[in-house]
């Protein structure tokens, strides 16, 4: 019997694929890959939903995750990806948008919601920022530092270990070559960067195809 699994990707503009006019971001690359495998394969299908919203923090995630999961729930199983932190850790008007402890609590709450629909849950690391925007107030009025990225990624790693979740380490994949993998704004990947993210993620979705 044909099996249909849903992959739900929650996140911000990096999940959505902003700044990639070529591929449309890493999830669109994965979507094309999954479609190709379906057409070549045994009838089972993995359907991917890009649920990224630009500028979203974990506060926004908590408002919508119960409804989104309810609306997209496959009887054959779901895979849930949570990709947050780049907006949470930003400092705006002298205040951190979502402080580390609150970030940890929000991700934990989101994971508890996700658990009602899936045992296949992945936390996605925050990417490093370009040196040119590290500690700099940009046009949006936000200031981000690579120091904070390390702190928030550690929270994600610890939660993944504590709750037996997957952890996708895009941070390490980007670190050495970040200046050529990030777009001109120093925060979002360019098409090369999104391609690199897809390369890291394909082996993960491969087991569900």
PLM feature segments, named:
Residues 1-54, 59-60, 66-76, 80, ...:
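Serine-esterase "nucleophile elbow" of acetyl-processing enzymes
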């Amino acid at each position: 019997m044909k099996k249909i699994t849903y992959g739900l990707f929650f996140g911000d503009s990096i999940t959505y694929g902003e700044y990639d006019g070529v591929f449309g971001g890493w999830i669109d690359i994965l979507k094309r890959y999954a479609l190709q495998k379906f057409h070549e394969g045994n009838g089972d299908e993995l359907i991917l939903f890009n649920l990224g919203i630009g500028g979203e923090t974990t506060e926004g995630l908590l408002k919508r995750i119960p409804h989104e999961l309810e609306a997209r729930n496959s009887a054959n199983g779901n895979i849930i990806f949570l990709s947050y932190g780049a907006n949470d850790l930003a400092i705006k008007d002298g205040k951190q948008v979502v402080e580390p402890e609150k970030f940890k609590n929000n991700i934990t709450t989101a994971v508890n919601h996700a658990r009602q629909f899936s045992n296949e849950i992945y936390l996605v690391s925050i990417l490093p920022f370009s040196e040119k925007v590290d500690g700099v107030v940009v046009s949006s009025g936000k200031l981000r530092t690579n120091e904070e990225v390390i702190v928030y990624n550690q929270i994600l790693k610890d939660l993944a270990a504590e709750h037996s979740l997957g952890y996708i380490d895009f941070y390490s994949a980007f670190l050495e070559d970040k200046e050529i993998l990030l777009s001109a704004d120093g925060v979002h990947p360019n098409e090369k960067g999104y391609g690199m993210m897809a390369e890291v993620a394909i082996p993960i979705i491969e087991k569900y195809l």
